[in-house]
Amino acid sequence: MKVAADNLIWYGRNFDYQDVRYFSFSSSGFCLVMKGKKASAKILSDPQNCDKTTKGVIGVFVSEGNDTSWNSLPQEPTYRYSLENTENDCILFESEEEKVVTIRVIKFSEAPFGYAGLKSLEIEGNLNPDFLKDYQSNNQLKVEIIGDSITCGYGIEGVFNKDSFTTQQERADKSYAFLTAKLLNAKLQCCSWSGIGLVSKYVDENTINPDTVITMPLLWPYTDRQTQLKLGLEPSVWDESRFSPDLVIVHLGTNDASWVKKVVERRLLYVSAL
């Protein structure tokens, strides 16, 4: 049985292009509840634009039952996939016995690197007829977190002062942003990018001019600027009606501080950007 993207619960920002739904931000992804023996998906990515340290990574979490709240999310993924190919065949669930399960696919790696796009999803069984309606109609708190590497889960599985960055060590589901959403049982949307700031990216101490190649004012207004540019598309303005947060947390400033330092004019520029 083929499952359409519109029949899934979606986390985070996403967009459709040529019958593929792209989800590239940290903690974005989708969820379904099914009764059956198997679920599999074709996930697109762009390994040609990545090296071995920057390929997209997703985690698949399977829990028995039909609870779609974060309370039922396992601590560790059932499957973990590095998106090594342009088209990746991913098993999401497999069992010899028919079971009722909740399946969540979550983007572990962040938007600047390998993207993820759901091309197709097939199940051996049936979708729960009510899970999407129940999710859409509940009154869960909605939280949007705008942040940098901390929100992305940068280096969470790395060893401090030993390992160099790789997307294999990113775990958005263990970031403070995600853990906050879990504790609040809130619907979460993250717009985050490692090294980003409001007026400058992270720069070394000898840099005179700010690095404005990408700053949050250039990222947040758009649905998914990076992925759409990779696909040769004009970045679309994010439709805020798709997710109207009750709470917005802006966790930015660490990278700005590398350039702002204690220079008054720079501090005023940062404050004006808030």
Predicted feature locations:
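N-terminal secretory targeting modules
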Residues: M1-I146, I150-A172
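Conserved SGNH/GDSL esterase-like catalytic core that processes O-acyl groups on lipids
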Residues: K162-L268
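Active-site neighborhood of glycoside hydrolase catalytic domains
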Residues: Y270-L274
